[in-house]
């Protein structure tokens, strides 16, 4: 597991998220997303230090 530095799409604040190694972050949005049909793509919620919810989509 590695720690990724991501930017909040609402305010630009940096937040950290633990992600499996060798993943590619595909998007960080404020809109909730459903899990894709592809087993290699996951969506996980998180929040920045300002309390904005965001959703991180990544691919294994």
Swiss-Prot record:
Which of UniProt's keywords are assigned here? Activator, Metal-binding, Transcription, Transcription regulation, Zinc, Zinc-finger
- Determine if Zinc-finger is one of this entry's keywords: yes
InterPro entries according to UniProt: Brz_Regulator
Which Gene Ontology terms cover its molecular function? zinc ion binding
Any Pfam family: Zn_ribbon_Brz
Q: Enumerate the residue ranges forming zinc fingers (C4-type).
A: 8-52
Per the entry, what this protein does is: Activates transcription of bacteriorhodopsin (bop) and phytoene synthase (crtB1). May interact with DNA or RNA via the zinc finger motif.
What NCBIfam families would the database entry show?
Brz (NF041795)
Give the family per the record: Belongs to the Brz family.
Q: What is this protein called?
A: Transcriptional regulator Brz
